[in-house]
């Protein structure tokens, strides 16, 4: 008889905090809190509100961000330029805001508005907030001040249209990301997305890729192609050399 060691199940977010988009790395989206229940739910009242109307050139109409809560602070994206805000969770006080005006690059982005949110990383000393702008740049911010981390990429930013295994127009290439980055230990994992809709306008759009970056320096560590190239597993399934010209394969 063979046995294997048991693996503990994900228990959900701890202490009422929410450190990742899915609550924990298992994406359980569960918090074992019991203060609010069926007997007192009807007595809840709004404690405070924060509006994102001024976080961009126009009011946002489709806020999809999931805020993070770390050490009593809320972090969220919001507004048409995908600004990042830090709020006091108890009072709603605005602690800091960071916004990138990407001009023509942001206007041409296939995935705009506030996106799904951001990611948090800490080594016990430093704390960082990481997110991807509409123009497809990975930004690292000091979680306490909102300032770009100077040792990450170039002045706190990594241009995701570079190092993409393809020559891309950094202004107009139709690739971006609506999702949050994923932090696994000291690696930030970023995918790619394209224009919404089930029927892409062109079969020869940008190819997708998933990449890992060093969370401290922004150095690209690895790249996984979603369309296998010659010599890679699965390339033979892309018949008539379609691997060479097709795209729109995001993750």
Labelled PLM ranges:
Residues 135, 146-147:
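Beta-rich strand-turn-strand
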Residues 18-22, 60-79, 83, 109-137, ...:
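Repeat-blade elements of multi-bladed beta-propeller folds
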């Amino acid at each position: 008889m063979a046995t294997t060691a048991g693996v503990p199940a994900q228990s959900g977010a701890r202490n009422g905090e929410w450190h990742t988009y899915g609550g924990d790395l298992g994406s359980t989206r569960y918090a074992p809190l019991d203060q609010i229940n069926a007997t007192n739910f009807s007595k809840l009242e709004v404690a405070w509100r924060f509006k994102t109307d001024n976080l961009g050139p126009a009011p946002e109409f489709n806020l999809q961000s999931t805020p993070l809560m770390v050490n009593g602070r809320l972090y969220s994206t919001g507004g048409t330029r995908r600004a990042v805000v830090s709020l006091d969770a108890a009072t709603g006080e605005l602690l800091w805001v960071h916004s990138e005006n990407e001009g023509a690059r942001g206007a041409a982005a296939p995935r705009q508005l506030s996106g799904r949110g951001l990611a948090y990383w800490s080594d016990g000393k430093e704390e960082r907030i990481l997110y991807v702008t509409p123009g497809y740049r990975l930004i690292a911010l000091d979680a306490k001040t909102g300032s770009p981390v100077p040792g990450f990429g170039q002045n706190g930013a990594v241009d995701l249209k570079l190092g993409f295994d393809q020559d891309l127009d950094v202004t107009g290439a139709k690739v971006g990301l609506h999702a949050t980055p994923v932090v696994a230990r000291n690696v930030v994992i970023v995918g790619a997305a394209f224009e919404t809709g089930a029927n892409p306008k062109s079969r020869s759009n940008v190819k997708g890729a998933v990449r890992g970056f060093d969370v401290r320096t922004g150095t690209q560590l690895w790249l996984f192609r979603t369309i296998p190239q010659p010599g890679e597993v699965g390339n033979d399934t892309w018949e008539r050399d379609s691997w060479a010209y097709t795209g729109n394969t995001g993750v």
